[in-house]
Swiss-Prot record:
Component of the Arp2/3 complex, a multiprotein complex that mediates actin polymerization upon stimulation by nucleation-promoting factor (NPF). The Arp2/3 complex mediates the formation of branched actin networks in the cytoplasm, providing the force for cell motility. In addition to its role in the cytoplasmic cytoskeleton, the Arp2/3 complex also promotes actin polymerization in the nucleus, thereby regulating gene transcription and repair of damaged DNA. Belongs to the ARPC5 family. Its main location: cytoplasm. GO terms for molecular function: actin filament binding. GO terms for cellular component: Arp2/3 protein complex; cell projection; cytoplasm; nucleus; site of double-strand break. It is found in: Cytoplasm, Cytoskeleton; Cell projection; Nucleus. This is Actin-related protein 2/3 complex subunit 5-A. It comes from the Eukaryota. Signal peptide: none annotated. It comes from Xenopus laevis (African clawed frog). Keywords: Actin-binding, Cell projection, Cytoplasm, Cytoskeleton, Nucleus. Component of the Arp2/3 complex composed of actr2/arp2, actr3/arp3, arpc1 (arpc1a or arpc1b), arpc2, arpc3, arpc4 and arpc5. GO terms for biological process: Arp2/3 complex-mediated actin nucleation; cell migration; regulation of actin filament polymerization.
Length: 150
């Protein structure tokens, strides 16, 4: 018989360390995320640069933070940009986004559906239609199954 069969070293392995469902508080990683720069977005909207406003609004999303006011501020800013787009410019704007930005846009669209305001539902449905046409059903699945929310 081998000598190491009575060894107890295997008992020192923490199997919970390898569990993918284990809760890990990632608050420290998201401390610096305060959301998109409102001044940059507002100046792009006033200047008529809607594509730049959309890019700026989707930049630096407050995903890893638990600060709800930062998340609400970012949601309102993105919603403001989406509402200010003309209907015929939406498709071109969505096509200019990469895969991650389109998924982030879909997260904001679904977040906007949670709390509808004046005219936001109709505009969000137009954006959803165009984003779905560009990104496909996979984008919806990624948004609905994502653990990190906006």
């Amino acid at each position: 018989m081998a000598k190491n069969t009575v060894s107890a070293r295997f008992r020192k392995v923490d199997v919970d360390e390898y569990d993918e469902n284990k809760f890990v508080d990632e608050e420290e990683a998201g401390e610096g995320q305060q959301g998109p720069d409102e001044g940059e977005v507002d100046s792009a909207i006033r200047g008529g640069n809607m594509m730049g406003a959309l890019q700026a609004a989707l930049k630096n999303p407050p995903i890893n933070t638990k600060n709800q006011s930062a998340k609400d501020r970012a949601e309102n800013l993105v919603l403001k940009v989406l509402i200010s787009f003309k209907a015929n410019e939406i498709e071109k704007a969505v096509q200019s986004l990469d895969k991650n930005s389109t998924d982030l846009l879909m997260k904001y669209i679904y977040k906007g559906f949670e709390s509808p305001s004046d005219n936001s539902s109709a505009v969000l449905l137009q954006w959803h239609e165009k984003a779905l046409a560009v990104a496909g059903v996979g984008s919806i699945v990624r948004v609905l199954t994502a653990r990190k929310t906006v």
